[in-house]
Design a protein with these regions (language model features):
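Short coil-to-helix segment of the ABC ATPase nucleotide-binding domain corresponding to the Q-loop/switch region
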Residues: 94-103
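Conserved ABC ATPase signature
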Residues: 136-140, 144
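A short, proline-enriched helix->beta-strand linker immediately N-terminal to the Walker B motif
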Residues: 155-159
Length: 252
């Protein structure tokens, strides 16, 4: 575990939108272990993305939130979070390397640009796109664009990484490869991944929660002790079925 890894504990949290009578989340408790992947599943509307937005400090005054958030080093999460969304969010008028550098330059305007460029080139090489530094986003496939987004996330070098279905729009083989790549490159980061794919959850989770019920609360499921990304075996198949069984309770 790297020295800047940070664990996060969310305790007894509840959330209600001001224009709704009933809460979306209630009694929610999550342990986001330092340097590990925590995976959240749940039906649409169960509050998964809202949890990420809360962690990122992006909730507005339309939401009433109660609960306790504590970090393992007792420091605030402000400025220690990187966010990777389902859409790659690449700016079409910037080259690949400029997209990778963009967030870092906003956050570190005084840093040396030559050093930034060299770091970005190293990250593009790590995601297999060293030859595309000067390409434009519209010249890339969907999988390549998400690899650029992954490089941009790494460029921010934050100890906590929030991922909101970043691989869901990709074909099965590309998704599998990017899962493995992200697992390798984000090792020692504290990662929170939202997914609707039980198989993806089984491959990547060190901790796994299903948001279930109305209002939703978090139900923890035990994961295999094998290292991630996992090779799918019989134990993984059993966990995948357990996830589906838990999710189906919201449709009964």
């Amino acid at each position: 575990m790297s020295v800047n890894s940070v664990g996060v504990q969310l305790s007894n949290a509840s959330l209600r939108y001001n224009d709704r009578e009933h809460a979306t989340l209630s009694g929610l408790s999550l342990s986001l272990n330092a340097g590990k992947w925590t995976v959240l599943l749940g039906r649409s509307g169960s509050g998964k993305t809202t949890v990420l937005r809360y962690l990122a400090g992006l909730l507005d005054d339309k939401v009433e939130w109660q609960g306790t958030l504590a970090t393992s080093d007792e420091l605030p999460l402000t400025d220690r979070i990187a966010y990777m969304a389902q859409q790659d969010l690449l700016l079409p008028w910037l080259s690949v390397i400029d997209n990778v550098c963009l967030s870092h330059r906003f956050q570190n305007p005084a840093s040396d640009k030559a050093q930034q460029t060299n770091q970005a080139l190293e990250l593009l090489a790590a995601v297999g796109l060293a030859d595309y530094a000067n390409a434009m986003p519209d010249q890339l496939s969907g999988g390549m664009r998400q690899r650029v987004a992954l490089a941009r996330t790494l460029m921010q070098d934050k100890p906590v990484v929030l991922m909101d279905e970043p691989f869901s729009a990709l074909d099965a083989v590309t998704r599998h490869k990017l899962q493995s790549l992200a697992c390798e490159l984000l090792r020692d980061k504290t990662v929170v991944l939202i997914t609707h794919d039980p198989q993806e959850a089984v491959r990547l989770a060190d901790n796994l929660y299903v948001l279930q019920g109305t209002p939703a609360s978090a139900h923890s499921l035990s994961v295999p002790l094998t290292s991630t990304p996992r090779v799918l075996d019989g134990e993984c198949a059993e966990l995948q079925q357990a996830i589906l069984d838990q999710l189906e309770r919201d449709y009964e």
